[in-house]
Design a protein with these regions (language model features):
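Non-cysteine beta-strand/loop elements that form the S-adenosyl-L-methionine
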Residues: 197-215, 277-285
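Hydrophobic faces of well-ordered beta-strands that scaffold small-molecule active sites
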Residues: 96, 147-149, 183-185, 207-209, ...
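Radical SAM enzyme [4Fe-4S]-AdoMet core and its adjacent flexible, acidic
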Residues: 216-235, 239, 243-347, 371-373
Length: 457
């Protein structure tokens, strides 16, 4: 299926070739011609635009578009569906989410983990389960060399000694197995101290720091267990960690915006004011029965907020500022591999989550839903049910009706499986509100690149 997407933003006429990935900046006449290009003859297009453009200019612009099409840069065919790397893929486990703590010292109002215990009892992962998880990852990773382990929760710092021992264990096991394990930790920062900061900065390839933005916004959504604000507790610790972080390691400050702060660009700018250059702020995902949940009626304001902030960020980057916003980061020259573009996160096949008692789930969003348990690390033989593996493996953009004609499918890769199931009861029916926001973020990201390429040094 040949697809393009065109839109206008910040003075640019942007045209995307969906299948090939080419992005074009075109003049007004070419932009108008594309309204009719597929369905009308050149003669008819000349007639339709007679009151707007001279005949010769229409012909010239049309011929330029036709040349792009002939070169495979516009209305290109889809070569991914039958690509050998997709058709013949044999996924192996390459990433673990280790829920080392089903407990938390905050009680965030939007928490999908139900304040850390995922709807069960509070518990911490024993060291032996963590070691079995790393063994499982190494054994199931096939020829894959680079592996990922994310210490998650709940709040992983509540099980700090086990985290340290598991890093040590991973380092002991990786070289003999010919692997390279990259560790990540996601933390709310409450328990950070100098010892933990030093260890994280030395051993964690990435650190995800949970902060929602301005003090009133953060404290309103992320109170402590005794209903006090947590902003003043965590911000100084995060600033210290980031100021001491080695340049060869990553971090990002990650927030969540809700209906209470639809002006979330102010929260992102607050991150920058605090000295955090690498940021992300995610839309809350929750049922509309919660007053802070996003609704379709919020989309116009959210779209405007994204677009206004993209224009601002482009200007900042033109001035040499290093601020980066995760959702506006895009590589137009060398993006994700074919499989990643089509299948997304790999949950249930390439990525799994492990709970403190050793249960294996497709990802952390499914923890607590017994029907999605893939096995347990204490089983003598771990045989992940083929039915569940297949369900996730086949949940790619070509099997999702809403994705097949969508221009954004190779950027969002079909969206979040958990959101599809939670909102629609069907892994092949994407969460529409999330789709709409993702489309706007992609448009903004490409506009920023257009601005930098045309006006940068």
């Amino acid at each position: 299926m040949k697809l393009i997407h065109k839109y206008q933003m910040n003075g640019f006429n942007i045209v995307m070739d969906v299948n090939g990935g080419a992005v074009h900046l075109v003049d007004d006449i070419s932009y108008r011609i594309l309204d009719f290009y597929e369905e009308k003859t050149l003669t008819k297009i000349i007639e339709l635009l007679a009151n707007e453009y001279e005949k010769d200019k229409v012909i010239d612009a049309y011929n330029e578009l036709k040349e792009l099409e002939n070169e495979g840069l516009l209305f290109s065919i889809d070569e991914y569906k039958d690509h050998p790397s997709f058709v013949n893929r044999q996924p192996v486990v390459k990433a673990l989410c280790l829920n080392v703590a089903h407990d938390c010292n905050l009680k965030c109002k939007y928490c999908f983990a139900k304040q850390g215990d995922f709807g069960g009892r509070a518990e911490l992962m024993p060291l032996d389960i963590g070691k079995k998880a790393i063994d499982f990852l190494i054994e199931r990773s096939g020829n894959r060399r680079n592996l990922e382990v994310d210490f998650f929760g709940g709040e992983p710092l509540m099980n700090w000694e086990v985290v340290k021992e598991l890093v040590k264990y991973g380092r002991e096991k990786e070289k003999p197995a010919g692997k390279n394990i990259r560790f990540t930790i996601t933390t709310n920062g409450v328990l950070l101290d100098d010892e933990k900061i030093n260890f994280i900065n030395e051993n964690m390839h990435n650190a995800v720091l949970s902060l929602d933005g301005r003090k009133d916004v953060h404290d309103g959504m992320r109170p402590t267990v005794n209903d006090k604000g947590s902003y003043d507790i965590v911000v100084p610790k995060f600033r210290k960690l980031v100021s001491q972080r080695p340049k060869d390691k990553y971090y990002y400050v990650r927030g969540t915006f809700t209906r209470d702060n639809l002006d979330f660009s102010k929260d992102v700018n607050h991150f920058y004011d605090l000295g955090f250059e690498l940021t992300s702020i995610e839309p809350v995902v929750d049922d509309e029965s919660n007053p802070f949940a996003l609704r379709d009626s919020d989309l116009p304001m959210i779209f405007k907020e994204y677009e206004d902030y993209a224009i601002e960020l482009a200007e900042r980057q033109l001035k040499g500022e290093k601020n980066k916003f995760f959702h506006f980061t895009i590589d137009l020259n060398q993006g994700p591999c074919v499989i990643k573009r089509i299948t997304g996160c790999g949950a249930g096949n390439e990525y799994v989550s492990i709970t403190p008692n050793g249960d294996i789930y497709p990802c952390h969003q499914f923890v607590g839903k017994d029907e999605y348990i893939l096995g347990n690390l204490n089983d003598e033989e771990i045989e992940i049910p083929e039915e569940i593996k297949s369900m996730f493996r086949e949940a790619h953009v070509y099997n999702k009706e809403a994705c097949q004609k969508c221009w954004n499918k190779f950027y969002c890769s079909g969206g979040c499986h958990a959101n599809a199931i939670n909102f629609n009861g069907d892994i092949k029916q994407p969460y529409d509100l999330g789709c709409q926001m993702q489309k706007k973020r992609t448009e903004c990201a490409i506009m920023i690149q257009a601005k930098l390429m045309t006006q940068g040094q």
